[in-house]
């Protein structure tokens, strides 16, 4: 009897150790609110990327090595359907984990992952907008022609070395689609990028970041499947009483023959000012083109009230301007809603 109890205790210890070495986590966020103009409004998530859940896992393989995976699904709060960056539930409707789906290995030398994921420039630039890129007040530069997400990607991330971190990625030329390439500015008020994706270059990208204390600076490069190239420079500094963020992106659009069609430059500056449980946000973004009647700009202002660490109320206003701010594209937009993270 004592031997049986001892055996059970030993097995239990091994089982506990094994379970402690691996884990699977469910996380995500839900956003619902009203978005519109003075003439029209609709119910939905202003920050569409906040209506998503992630299944992630990690297993300790010993010797400082671990295996991990991420599966990320986005949905529409108003009807429960799948959602993509276009907001159209019909796009990529057969792609369950449209946002991210990859597996990888990590060690002291960094990590390498394979699957579908954000490319380095788009992975970096979202962190330098005070509005987190998605609300109507957002002054995010958007990545110009940079690949947003790529299928069949191999992605390397180095460990942090003295505050510096390098990332690089390459994807297969086949199997990419137009919806994975950026190409609009200020929600229809700016640049429109032609979708000449039939020359099938391999999407590639790299980034270099320095982060230490209040400082965060980075550079990123991207070439999409049409051969369009984008350079991005980013920076932020946390002064304590407020945080200042900036972005600058430059891109050249080439046709199949390699002749330059358009050169675009876009920059933004924004700030986050915490006042107790309230966070004030404000920013300005502007872009220029070497072609006539293509300039655009936008001013955004908003606020977020933290009910807890995971739940907040928000409201924002975005006012586009410039050459392309005509018709509905020039309407001032607003949103008001609630976000809960889990």
Q: Where are the language model's segments positioned?
A:
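Outer-membrane beta-barrel proteins
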Residues: 1-342
